[in-house]
């Protein structure tokens, strides 16, 4: 990861979540990864995938709440009421996170009882080109 990619990933996450305080820096434990933070909170890792000649990134964030409060938790955390959690067709173990009409990520249950979730966001190199 170079400085330009880190800056673009940071801007992409800031725009996506509507949270200008998100920061992205190199992961001190893994030189091939970055880590996203929001204030003092570590949001999660950003992993590089450059298989097949296409460079993409995967952002994962653990969410320590149950399904009924997912939307409110994310809205409060990012101070953005435009974030909405929407059920997926024929899927009961995951939901979608949108900002307005824009799809952001899939949020999947970590266990069958849905006590905790993981947000998974794919970021393609094409997503970063305009930043």
Regions found by a protein language model. Give the residues of each.
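Terminal leader/tail segments of proteins
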Residues: 1-131
